[in-house]
Amino acid sequence: MIQVLLVTVCLAVFPYQGSSIILESGNVNDYEVVYPRKVTALPKRAVQQKYEDAMQYEFKVNGEPVVLHLEKNKGLFSEDYSETHYSPDGREITTYPSVEDHCYYHGRIHNDADSTASISACDGLKGYFKLQGETYLIEPLKLPDSEAHAVYKYENIEKEDEAPKMCGVTQNWESDESIKKASQLYLTPEQQRFPQRYVKLAIVVDYGMYTKYNRDSDKITVRVHEMVNHITEMYRPLNIDITLSLLDVWSEKDLITVQSDSDVTLEVFGDWRESVLLKRRSHDCAHLLTDTKLNDNTIGVAYKKGMCDPKLSVGLVQDYSKNVFMVAVTMTHEIGHNLGMEHDEDKNGKKCKCDTCIMSPVISDKQSKLFSDCSKNDYQTFLTNYKPQCILNAPLRTDTVSTPVSGNELLEEGEDCYCHIPPNPCCDPATCKLTPGSQCAEGLCCDQCRFKKKGTICRFARGDYPDDRCTGLSDDCPRWNDL
């Protein structure tokens, strides 16, 4: 039996709202100041790590209490993750840092089935969470001897300039090799559930970005780790594991000519990846982060359908914002092109316009960080038609299976249900198993430990989409197009 120790670290919420503030992530209008209260669940006599495997935080948003459940993102790094920089004479200096006890988490809000969270706990809480359909960001205020944090909505980040931020290259790439085409255009419910896929990602940082952060390798590393943690969370609904395989920082000079012509830079970077980077370390996709201002208000470019190709499985992303979440959304978008996704636009008879979705051609003030149904269909079609082989196999990870920890609010190996604090009457807190006679413990289609009847509305209609309804066989509330 696993016993749980509750540790209360800090108490209270400071009920203060401000109109404007300058944060590490940029200028923000309309924010809340909170003091999160931390409650940690640990097995008795557990070996203490610097960063726990699972944590809970309580604070208020808009006057309402929320409970944020976090679990360490153990798939963030590959087991052989490496970092490379360069000596003044051009020699590669590669290290293999220990990253198992890292400080990057994913999670959700208690009692909000559609919530998500991606948080760095390295120095306070920094990241984002989705609550009741709204995306909020949180970060420490960096006040002396204070645990104060700012919470604010995505749309309240002040623009650093007024020019629209756009994706540049979305050119189709067709292989010269024979490609097996799908015999059916209709995607079956089984296809819609998305098979598990794995992308080993390489991030390259150019010299301009390195100097932008005062040649501080630690600052660059933290920024990239935060970015990839966000990206991995955004790809979870598609059943894609993004694992950071390597970080290559051009610390002495650029190893290619990085210019504002994004098409040219992307092509040259693809050549360098094929001839140099792939020979050094195996990976599936490489993206170059640059401080160079790209032409035509472009902030990112990538080859569509290029995933797994030695030259074309690449992208180029401008580090255009102090806010790492905004740059992470852009890289998520460009990886989407590598995976066959088109822009969310109305064209060729397809009604796909979605200004707030990840694959919108122009970044929105109200970014939702969701993939549209059109993007999901594009991705599934890419898998069916192109059958990319490199993303089939799971990479070695720093920690693939954790010891079950009761009370961490995320389902782990051997558990049937989430062990709540306080306990859920449908779930045995000692074993994380359903109590006798219970079919479920929670979920939009669970009521008093039993599945709701087939046809019960579990999510009301939004826009052009109809109501989502329970199946009577599960506690999940399936999207209408998964039925």
Swiss-Prot record:
Residues of the signal peptide: 1-20
Annotated motif Cell attachment site, positions: 462-464
Top enzyme category: hydrolase
Cleaved propeptide residues: 21-190, 396-411
Enzyme Commission number(s): 3.4.24.-
Cofactor annotation remark: Binds 1 zinc ion per subunit.
Domain Peptidase M12B: 197-395
Expression sites (tissue/organ): Expressed by the venom gland.
Any one Gene Ontology cellular component term annotated for this protein: plasma membrane
Key words, A-Z: Cell adhesion impairing toxin, Disulfide bond, Hemostasis impairing toxin, Hydrolase, Metal-binding, Metalloprotease, Platelet aggregation inhibiting toxin, Protease, Secreted, Signal, Toxin, Zinc, Zymogen
Domain Disintegrin: 403-483
Localization annotation: Secreted
Cofactor field: Zn(2+)
Keyword hit for Hydrolase: yes
Subunit structure: Monomer.
Note: The disintegrin belongs to the medium disintegrin subfamily.
Protein name, as recorded: Zinc metalloproteinase/disintegrin
Protein species of origin: Protobothrops jerdonii
